[in-house]
Amino acid sequence: VYGIPQAMVQVMERAGVDFATLGGDEWCCGYPLFTAGMEGLVAPLMEHNVARLQDMGAKTLVTTCPSCHYTWSHLYPLLGAPPIDIEVLHASQYLVRILESGQLRLGAFEQVVTYHDPCDLGRKSGIFDEPRQVIEGVPGVELREMDGSREEALCCGGGGDVQIVDESVTAAVADRRLGQAQRTGARLVLSACQQCKRTLMAAARRNKVRVRVMDVAELVWRAMEG
């Protein structure tokens, strides 16, 4: 899953985007603690992260993680973060901007794919269209929707810290979602979340299913390199 932010960095560099990363100053956003009921432990992380971003003078924050996006855009204000003049975008939203600007030349990527909506990106943040716009912006890709998509999408099984509590629940839900993906006939399952990728990859290995799982940022990077 480390390949996801690495792919995004490669895409942004190729597009000529002026950006920086926090490196070692990037702390966890605190979302796993919040979902575990440890709200009081989130504040130090929030204060550190907000201060570092202000120090950089950044105007836009781009994250490849839907949980981080939800935390910065929804939870931090609720938890008392000071108002900051920073636009918070998920990577899929920023990729749409890059593709629409014409800053990238993409090669053909002939593949039938299906897309899994992450819970934190879709139902919780309302971001459904942008990942699909990215997918459809890659030449040669045919997108086939699963039975459950958008608001009706099944969880990958790995959200909400559930895997820490009961891995069997995660496995059962992931197996069901993988079955929905298989029925589309796609050989490539796309998502926009590192946890979804990890969980669905594990399900494919467990069930010996010959499908690949990839993030939309990795799709753009592959098409860019191709």
Predicted regions and their residues:
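Iron-sulfur cluster-binding electron-transfer modules in prokaryotic oxidoreductases
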Residues: 1-226
